[in-house]
Regions:
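ABC ATPase NBD Q-loop/coupling interface
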Residues: 65-81, 145
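Q-loop/switch helix immediately C-terminal to the Walker
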Residues: 92, 98-113, 125
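The feature captures the beta-strand-to-loop junction immediately N-terminal to the Walker
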Residues: 39-41
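Helical segment within the ABC ATPase nucleotide-binding domain
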Residues: 183-196
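Conserved beta-strand-loop-alpha-helix hinge in the C-terminal portion
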Residues: 217, 225-247
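Walker B catalytic motif
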Residues: 173-174
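ABC ATPase C-loop
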Residues: 161-162
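A short, flexible loop at the N-terminus of ABC-type nucleotide-binding domains that lies
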Residues: 2-8, 12-25, 31, 37, ...
């Protein structure tokens, strides 16, 4: 068996001077080729986990370790993790005036590989990937995400994923706010990226983005930790019984004697197989 791509060990994450605990005792192991889905009610810690993995300075790791590609990156800044091959797609991508989408991608690619970018080959691949995502080539010359629609911003994120080819992609509600056609396009981009050598962690409210992907593990977060892990059939069961309720509910998810409980709703866990 190959070595783990990511190991999260007994992770505790706090925020603010009062050190409010957002994650506590969280463990997670991911191997190359795997797809993991995070589910849980609002405030369960899904986005916090993604941000902490990427090294967001707003959060402090007060216990535990984050091991990426065999290297302890627990206290490394985001740029070090990015150069090692970690990528985070934001719920709301930032606008960056003054740097075009093409220049951003070329600079990022150079920083990650440490090698000069071959301009002709780069532009050819960029044009091909933009066409596949239904993005007009003129967006390459526009400032990054400035004036982009919500859908174009999300496509820009997937374009970055395809061009930079990270080892681990953290997709935080990349499909949120998109219409049906845009979700399909984003899903196609995610499928085009994924292979046996990289891995995905996905937060989503929409099962459509998972179509065509083999979901290896589904993790339900509650009370600052992962409280349940299952295979792809658990994800199917949760979506079938509750739809978006599992992700949108303000209530905790509970597992008790073979039943899944979300707020006042109860469903049999046995439908997960």
């Amino acid at each position: 068996m190959s070595s783990p791509l990511l190991e999260v060990k007994d992770l505790q994450v706090t925020v603010g001077e009062e050190q409010k605990v957002l994650l506590d005792g969280l463990n997670l192991t991911i191997y190359p080729g795997e797809t993991h889905v995070l589910m849980g009610h609002n405030g369960a810690g899904k986005s916090t986990l993604m941000s902490a993995l990427m090294g967001d300075p707003r959060y402090t790791v007060t216990r535990g370790q984050i091991i990426f590609k065999g290297q302890d990156v627990t206290h490394e800044p985001a740029d070090v993790r990015a150069k090692l091959g970690m990528f985070l797609s934001f719920q709301t991508p930032e606008e960056i005036p003054g740097i075009t989408l093409e220049n951003f991608l070329r600079t990022a690619q150079n920083a990650i590989t440490g090698k000069p970018v071959k301009v002709f080959a780069f532009r050819k691949e960029l044009a091909q990937q933009m066409e596949a995502l239904g993005m007009d080539e003129s967006y390459a010359d526009r400032y990054l995400n400035v004036g982009f629609s919500g859908g174009e911003k999300k496509k820009s994120e997937i374009l970055q994923l395809l061009m930079l080819k990270p080892s681990l992609a953290l997709l935080d509600e990349t499909d949120s706010g998109l219409d049906v056609d845009a979700v399909k396009t984003v899903a196609q981009g995610v499928r085009a990226y994924h292979n046996k050598d990289n891995a995905l962690i996905i937060i989503t409210h929409n099962a459509k983005i998972l179509e065509g992907l083999q979901v290896d593990y589904v993790h339900v977060l509650d009370d600052a930790r992962i409280v349940r892990t299952g295979d792809g059939s658990l994800e199917n069961a949760l979506f079938c019984v509750y739809g978006n309720a599992i992700s949108n509910s303000l209530y905790p998810v509970e597992f008790d004697n073979g039943y899944i409980r979300v707020g006042g709703y109860v469903g049999s866990e046995s439908i997960a197989g």
